[in-house]
């Protein structure tokens, strides 16, 4: 830091005070109050600084997070499932400084004032304390998008077979509900019980919640008794339409793989409605395949 000895001493005292037991813990907020923002606030107290005019294109928290996860598609997909619409808001310079690497880039261009009021660079030099080699990304063809495409193709094939032959692939529907419910359990817990930001504004709670897990045993028992189940015709269809509407209205950025999964739900729901309403016209039904 390009600061005077008096400013350095003041910064040191502030750090000592911050390290006291009554001050050393705080509610961590990875978007707005994290280790980077705390360090920047400490610097700003002793050496107020200015940033150059913002010439960066408009970006969001989600865009920045994606820039760090582009080599890990499953990690990116998982984060997109739990982070809500709060991360889709446009950011100013100060908000972007919550990210360590972006903060480093901006601080190299920041200026402060010396004792005479002259504008000087905030940073005098840079030193790499620990040089950690970057790990090579592990490429895999089984990305969330590829898996979702394969699942959609399987859904189309099985649905067409049902319409042509009257056979019912209940095991496929039950597996789809199980996966939906397990993912929904994570989203549900974060949505209602987590104090972290963004997870409580997740529109995907409409399709990813524990309801499929709760209803799955009921569905199995009804089908064993030869009764029509209403999960896929009603909730499955509505949840899929809800997800597509959220994406269409741009209320939240929904990953493409999730949209394809919603199409699978929608297709199975519509097939269930057709099978339910047109059952006498079909060739008949059979057990799981």
Identify what each model region corresponds to.
Residues 1-135:
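Soluble extramembrane regions of membrane proteins in the secretory/endomembrane system
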